[in-house]
A protein has these predicted regions:
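Metal-dependent phosphoester-hydrolase catalytic domains
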Residues: 19, 168-176, 182-272
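Structured beta-strand-rich core segments of catalytic domains in phosphoester-bond hydrolases
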Residues: 85-148, 154
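N-terminal, active-site-proximal structural segment of metallo-dependent hydrolase catalytic domains
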Residues: 18-97, 109, 267-272
């Protein structure tokens, strides 16, 4: 129990500074299977319907929408990448529920489970220019404070290396990769793991077999990054001190996600 308390306190201290005034940052949040309540014709999501084994009705759906929006608003960064949303209507519902005035980009991933990526952003801070879709990844090229910035959200993408080969051909391309990068040899493209400090300190964003793991990470070629870590608030955890999941062993718990968000931010309005 003492070890758990020390871990949680270290996370709280690490994330408190992310609320500083004029920093710019990007977060990534695996929302853990946020389906709507309507059966799909293209993949099997019957479990997440009112008649399915999870009893996924409009009340449970609306509750989770509000929870995800609360997390996004709490993070309060100009760009938040999401993974695990079923479709564009789900993204619209999240954005509508947010207090922050987010615009969004959504693309259908056409995966076996029907789960997509979305990028929420403040339109006065990040200016998207081009969207590139890859299996297991969403890449958005744009500008932030008159500097080129490319944001890649990924979840076990097998084509991430090919995408990076394309992106690295551009000069002065500032790139941030967030999510589950699998076994990517990121050093090949001169990237560093911005979340390495959190990993070495034993911090994680998911519990596997009773142990914290940093399932998602942040990779970047930007040298001026100020901090990258796991985002934590007490209400994101259950009474055991683990991520407050929507379902646990098939039982509805009404929580947020079995993952915690991760983030990277920069002081002085993008000093890169």
């Amino acid at each position: 129990m003492r070890a758990l308390l020390v871990f949680l306190l270290s996370l709280l201290c690490a994330t408190a500074s992310a609320q500083k005034g004029n920093s710019f940052g990007v977060a990534y949040y695996n929302v853990d299977k946020l389906y709507d309540t309507i059966p799909s014709r293209f993949y099997d999501d019957r479990a997440y319907t009112p008649a399915g084994c999870f009893g996924w009705d409009s009340n449970r759906y609306t509750h989770k929408i509000k929870q995800v929006a609360a997390v996004v608003d709490s993070i309060a960064l100009p760009v938040v990448a999401l993974y695990g949303v079923e479709n564009e209507q789900v993204v619209k519902d999240i954005v509508t529920a947010c207090r922050g005035d987010y615009s969004y980009i959504h693309r259908t991933a056409n995966g076996y489970d029907g789960l997509d990526f979305a990028l929420l952003y403040f339109a006065d801070c990040f200016y998207p220019d081009k969207v590139i879709e890859r299996q297991g990844a969403l890449c958005v090229e744009g500008e932030a404070f008159d500097r080129p910035l490319t944001i890649v959200a990924t979840h076990r993408s097998r084509s991430l290396g090919v995408l990076l080969d394309e992106l690295k051909t551009a000069e002065d391309n500032n790139i941030i990769i967030l999510g589950d990068a699998g076994k990517l040899n990121f050093k090949k493209w001169a990237f560093v793991e911005a979340t390495l400090g959190a990993r070495l300190a034993g911090r994680g964003n998911r519990i596997l077999r009773g142990v914290w793991h940093l399932q998602d990470c942040v990779l970047t070629n930007i040298e001026a990054q100020n901090r990258s870590d796991v985002y934590i608030r007490p209400w994101l955890l259950d009474r055991r001190g683990v991520p407050f999941a929507t379902f646990q062993g098939g039982k509805y718990c009404g929580g947020y996600s079995s993952y915690l968000p991760i983030y990277i931010y920069f002081d002085n309005l993008f000093a890169f």
